Amino acid sequence: MPTIHYHISDLRVALRPYRTAQRIALVPTMGNLHDGHLELVKIAKQHADIVVVSIFVNPTQFGVGEDFDSYPRTLDEDVAKLAMVGADYVFAPTIDEMYPVLPPPTTILAGTITEQLCGKTRPNHFDGVGIVVSKLFNIVQPNIAVFGQKDYQQLAIIKQLVRDLSYSIDIIGAPIIRATDGLALSSRNQYLSESERQTAPILQQELQYSAKQISDNKQPLEVLLTAAHERITSAGFIIDYLEVKTTELTAVDDESINNHQDLVILVAAWLGRARLLDNRLVTINKV
């Protein structure tokens, strides 16, 4: 079983012997772990000697009316799952341990990259992500950290944060893990009713179809995205966004599309109580 620490000072003492000759990996999570999280741990073990998994439902990244209070807390089950994949340490701090003052007087503002996509409807979300990830980096001082590519914008922001703040940490983006029907695994999938769960894979099917159309580059992006938006909406989703970006999350249009080898199509959509995220990388077929 992994060793559980609840206090910053205890975790630092536990990790001190490894810092000289061994590599430490961090896998930050909010708990309620599924196979996607466990895959992050497996990847971390391939790149490091010691794997630390943080489990902390971070209040600073939730907005008013979001699901902070109802977000599942399943620490005992999570630790049992982490034991099966060989995690070494679990860091499960309280809110008071992480934030002596809440909201914290110090903030991390990641700039314009946060103002698009999820940032449009969750305006303070990535500020909260920035502060908690920075704190975890300072507490654990890992050599590597592993994040899932499902949260594509978050991954891009964390890479920027590491670069801008000169952290000596290698960031690994892990591929999206999907259910057998293609739905991207997410802790919030459990909010789906039985009928909604049957509908949910349509989201990735539409992404896959649209990615192929973008790759072939045979019709304007606006036409393609409008048609996809209509199909997704008619299936019962409420779309937050459906956009095509460069892999660095800069804007792209029909005039500039051939300047890029790779793009990404990203979607966030509500289905009942569940806000689902997904994305697909797109390689442009050059004529």
Swiss-Prot record:
Lyase as a keyword of this entry, yes or no, is no
What the entry lists under Pfam families is as follows:
Pantoate_ligase
- Where beta-alanine binds, per the record, is at 61
- Report the EC code(s) recorded for this entry: 6.3.2.1
Q: Does the keyword Transcription regulation apply?
A: no
Molecular-function GO term, any one: pantoate-beta-alanine ligase activity
Q: Which reaction does it catalyse?
A: (R)-pantoate + beta-alanine + ATP = (R)-pantothenate + AMP + diphosphate + H(+)
Q: Name one GO biological process term.
A: pantothenate biosynthetic process
User: What is the first-listed, main subcellular location in coarse terms?
Assistant: cytoplasm
What are the binding positions for ATP in this chain?
30-37, 148-151, 177, 185-188
Query: What metabolic or biological pathway is this protein involved in?
Result: Cofactor biosynthesis; (R)-pantothenate biosynthesis; (R)-pantothenate from (R)-pantoate and beta-alanine: step 1/1
Question: Which residues are (R)-pantoate-binding?
Answer: 61, 154
InterPro entries in alphabetical order: Cyt_trans-like (IPR004821), Pantoate_ligase (IPR003721), Pantoate_ligase_C (IPR042176), Rossmann-like_a/b/a_fold (IPR014729)
Which residues carry out catalysis?
37
- Give the UniProt entry's GO cellular component terms: cytosol
UniProtKB keywords: ATP-binding, Cytoplasm, Ligase, Nucleotide-binding, Pantothenate biosynthesis
Its localization reads: Cytoplasm
Family designation: Belongs to the pantothenate synthetase family.
Q: What's the further remark here? A: The reaction proceeds by a bi uni uni bi ping pong mechanism.
Q: What does this protein do?
A: Catalyzes the condensation of pantoate with beta-alanine in an ATP-dependent reaction via a pantoyl-adenylate intermediate.
Task: Report quaternary structure and partners.
Answer: Homodimer.
Q: What is this protein called?
A: Pantothenate synthetase
